[in-house]
Swiss-Prot record:
PANTHER family: DELTA-1-PYRROLINE-5-CARBOXYLATE SYNTHASE (PTHR11063:SF8), GLUTAMATE SEMIALDEHYDE DEHYDROGENASE (PTHR11063). Its main location: cytoplasm. It is found in: Cytoplasm. Catalyzes the NADPH-dependent reduction of L-glutamate 5-phosphate into L-glutamate 5-semialdehyde and phosphate. The product spontaneously undergoes cyclization to form 1-pyrroline-5-carboxylate. Residues 1-26 are annotated as: Disordered. This is Gamma-glutamyl phosphate reductase. The gene is proA. Residues 1-11 have a biased composition (Polar residues). Belongs to the gamma-glutamyl phosphate reductase family. InterPro entries: Ald_DH/histidinol_DH, Ald_DH_C, Ald_DH_N, Aldehyde_DH_dom, G-glutamylP_reductase_CS, Glu-5-SA_DH, GPR_dom. It catalyses: L-glutamate 5-semialdehyde + phosphate + NADP(+) = L-glutamyl 5-phosphate + NADPH + H(+).
C-alpha cells in the first residue's frame, strides 16, 4: 500500500504531464534535427539573411503580438524598466534584424582547426571545432534574446530550444513562427528552432534535466533564475552570472580620469551586468581627491552607500551600508563606497564579494596594475578604462549569447567559438599500436 500511496502522491496532474511531454517531445525532435544538420557557411548565411528580412517585413504582426504582452504586463503591475525591456517597435525590430545580419559577417567556427601536429610514426592529428548540438536557452522578458539565440545557434551549427518568459509569450510565439517559416522555405525542418511552454516553472526543470537530449543550457536573467538553473540542472550549463562589478582607484591614479571612468561605468546603463556597483578608494588618496570622486558621483545623480563613520567626514547624504550593499547588484543609480588600504586590500575585498564578472582599476603605477591583473578573480579586468566595455560587440566578437562568469569551457563574453566543442581527428596509413 505504501508504494501505491507514494505513486499517487508523485503522479503528475494531467496538465503538468502534458507540459512535460511537450518539453521532452520537442527536445527529442531537436536532437534528431541536430544530428542531421549539415549546413555549410553559405547556407547558414542565406538562412539568417532571409530571417532578418522576414522580421522587418512582419514588423506590424510582431508589434501587435508585443502589444498583448505589454497590456498584460501593465495589468500585472510590471515596473517601467521591465516594460521597456519587453517592448518592441519598428526601430527595435530593425535592430534585432541587424543583429542577425551582423552574425552573417562573423567567421563560421565549425570546421576550424584549433591545433594539429604529426607524430613521429606518421599519424596526423588535428583538433577541429564542432557544434555542441541542442542548445537550451532559459531567459526572462527580453524578446530580442529569442532571435539572438537563433542566429548564434544556427551560425555555430546548433539547434536552439527556447524557454522564454511568460511575460513575452505572444511576442516570442510570433518571432519563432516567423523563424520557422523561413526555415521551412529553405527546405529545413520547422523544428530547427522551437519554443517551449512557459505556463509554469516546471517546464524549466524539464529542460535542464533532459540529459541525453539537451547538450547545453544557458540561463540569462537575474540571480534567482541563474542560480535555479545552475543548481537544478543535470544538463551541462554555462553560468552567465550577475555583475557585482568593482572599480578601485589607486593613489597613483589620474583622479579626474578615474572619476570619469567610475561615472561612465555606473551611469551609462545602470541596469546592465557590466555596470560599476562598488567603488573602492585607496586610503592613501588625498582627502580632496576622495571628496572630488564622491561629489561628482552625487552630481551625476548617484546615491552613495557605505560606512558612515568612514565617509561622513568627507561628504554628506551617505546611506549606511548593509551586507547586501556589498554582495548584490543595485541595477540602479546607487553605488557602494569603501576606503581600503591599497591594492592588496582592494583585491581581497573584490575576491570576497565579487561575482567574477568585470573588475576595474585606475592606477598609473605598473606594479599596482600588475598585482591587480594577476590576483583579482574576474572574467574581465579593466585597467584604466570603464567596466562598461565588457560586451561581445565591444570586444570585436559581434553578437554574444551572454557573459560567462564560470571558469570551465567558456569565460567572459561568449561568441560563436564558445558555442562549439571540439573533436580530434587522427589520419593514418595503416599504423597499428604495438
Amino acid at each position: 500500500m505504501t508504494n501505491s500511496n507514494e505513486a499517487q502522491e508523485n503522479a503528475l496532474s494531467p496538465e503538468r504531464q502534458a507540459e512535460r511531454d511537450e518539453v521532452l517531445a520537442k527536445a527529442k525532435k531537436a536532437k534528431e534535427v541536430s544530428s542531421q544538420l549539415l549546413l555549410n557557411t553559405q547556407q547558414k548565411n542565406d538562412l539568417l539573411a532571409d530571417a532578418a528580412d522576414a522580421l522587418e517585413a512582419n514588423a506590424a504582426d510582431i508589434i501587435a503580438a508585443n502589444e498583448k504582452d505589454i497590456a498584460t504586463g501593465k495589468e500585472r503591475g510590471f515596473a517601467d524598466s521591465l516594460l521597456d525591456r519587453l517592448a518592441l517597435d519598428t526601430e527595435r525590430i530593425s535592430g534585432i534584424a541587424g543583429g542577425l545580419r551582423q552574425v552573417i559577417g562573423l567567421s563560421d567556427p565549425v570546421g576550424e582547426i584549433v591545433r594539429g601536429h604529426t607524430r613521429p610514426n606518421g599519424l596526423r592529428m588535428k583538433q577541429v571545432r564542432v557544434p555542441l548540438g541542442v542548445m537550451g536557452m532559459v531567459y526572462e522578458a527580453r524578446p530580442n534574446v529569442t532571435v539572438d539565440a537563433f542566429g548564434l545557434a544556427i551560425k555555430s551549427g546548433n539547434v536552439p530550444l527556447l524557454r522564454g518568459s511568460k511575460s513575452a509569450r505572444h511576442t516570442n510565439e510570433k518571432l519563432v513562427q516567423i523563424l520557422q517559416d523561413v526555415a521551412e522555405s529553405h527546405n529545413l525542418p520547422r523544428e530547427l528552432v522551437q519554443l517551449l511552454p512557459c505556463d509554469t516553472h516546471d517546464s524549466v526543470q524539464d529542460l535542464i534535466t533532459a540529459r541525453g537530449l539537451v547538450d547545453l543550457v544557458i540561463p540569462r536573467g537575474g540571480a534567482g533564475l541563474i542560480n535555479a538553473v545552475v543548481l537544478g540542472a543535470t544538463v551541462p550549463t554555462i553560468e552567465t552570472g550577475t555583475g557585482n562589478c568593482h572599480f578601485y582607484i589607486d593613489s597613483s591614479a589620474d583622479i579626474e580620469e578615474a572619476t570619469k571612468l567610475v561615472i561612465n561605468g555606473k551611469t551609462r546603463r545602470c541596469s546592465v551586468c557590466n555596470a560599476t556597483e562598488v567603488v573602492l578608494l585607496d586610503s592613501a588618496l588625498p582627502d580632496p581627491d576622495k571628496i572630488y570622486v564622491l561629489q561628482e558621483l552625487q552630481k551625476a545623480g548617484v546615491t552613495l552607500h557605505g560606512e558612515k563613520k568612514q565617509l561622513d567626514p568627507l561628504i554628506n547624504d551617505v546611506v549606511q551600508a548593509e551586507e547586501t550593499d556589498w554582495t548584490d547588484e543595485y541595477l540602479s543609480f546607487d553605488i557602494a563606497v569603501a576606503i581600503v588600504d591599497g591594492v592588496e586590500e582592494a583585491v581581497a575585498h573584490i575576491n570576497r564579494y565579487g561575482t567574477s564578472h568585470t573588475e576595474g582599476i585606475a592606477a598609473r603605477d605598473y606594479k599596482t596594475t600588475s598585482y591587480f591583473e594577476q590576483y583579482v578573480d574576474a572574467a574581465a579586468v579593466s585597467i584604466n578604462t570603464s567596466t562598461a566595455w565588457t560586451d561581445g560587440e565591444m570586444f570585436g566578437f559581434g553578437a554574444e549569447i551572454g557573459i560567462s562568469t564560470q571558469k570551465l569551457h567558456a569565460r567572459g563574453p561568449m561568441g560563436l567559438p564558445e558555442l562549439t566543442s571540439t573533436k580530434w581527428v587522427i589520419n593514418g596509413e595503416g599504423q597499428v599500436r604495438p
